[in-house]
Amino acid sequence: MTKIDLLARVFVIATIIALATAVDYYKLKCPPKTKHTMCIYGTNSHPSRNCGVVKGSGPTDQEKREILKEHNDYGHKVASGEEKRGVNGGQPAAKNMEDMTWDDELAKVAQTWANQCTINHDKCRSVSRFSVGQNLASKSTTGNDFPPVVELIQLWENEVSDFDKNNIKSLPASGISKTGHYTQMVWAKSNKLGCGSIKHHKDGWNKHFLVCNYGPSGNYLGQSVYEV
């Protein structure tokens, strides 16, 4: 086999793999009249013009570690009964909360959505393994730097102040209207995490936009957030 033949065969195999990956997203079930984020924007999307001047796309390796650590540290705090904030008192300890691990596919889908700089949830983001939940946060500053990623996650944690501990065993619709980011963070069955981010300058502000995707998805009405 010549070198050219070998390269051609490698190219064909790579193309087949790429097409298979794209087709997988097309096969996933989405809500009526919606399309999967990866089908709309492709697997190699770039930041939208809507972002303004982009200063950074995607969390750095250090930020990935910080994101994962913050989620797990806070999960430990809640699971051990040390979270004292909340309606009707602090949050009860958890029996079944797992540590989260980083998931590259979730991060890829999250980054594709973050690249759009739209502070709304995308309509379809599931992967073949499970349905996917999502948290969004954006914070701005007029300084030269961008808000640290941990500060964005803490916005979700702070929602616990509005969460009634009596809703842990069966989540009502009212339980996610103000506190859905918090409940997704501590949802016991969500043990995979992947996030995307954009640091951009727009309208005179330095903005840090964070999208975190969680699998399996949490925030199912009528189900327990975690076991007490």
From Swiss-Prot:
Main localisation: secreted
Disulfide links within the chain: C30-C124, C51-C117, C195-C212
Expression tissues: Expressed by the venom gland.
A Pfam family reported for this protein in Swiss-Prot or TrEMBL: CAP
SMART domains according to UniProt: SCP
Localization per record: Secreted
InterPro entries: Allrgn_V5/Tpx1_CS, CAP_dom, CAP_sf, CRISP-related, V5_allergen-like
Residues spanning the signal sequence: 1-22
One cellular component (GO) term of this entry: extracellular region
SUPFAM superfamilies in alphabetical order: PR-1-like
Top-level taxon in the UniProt lineage: Eukaryota
Keyword terms of this UniProt record: Allergen, Disulfide bond, Secreted, Signal
Sequence ranges assigned to domain SCP in this UniProt record: 69-214
Family under the similarity heading: Belongs to the CRISP family. Venom allergen 5-like subfamily.
Name of the protein this chain belongs to: Venom allergen 5
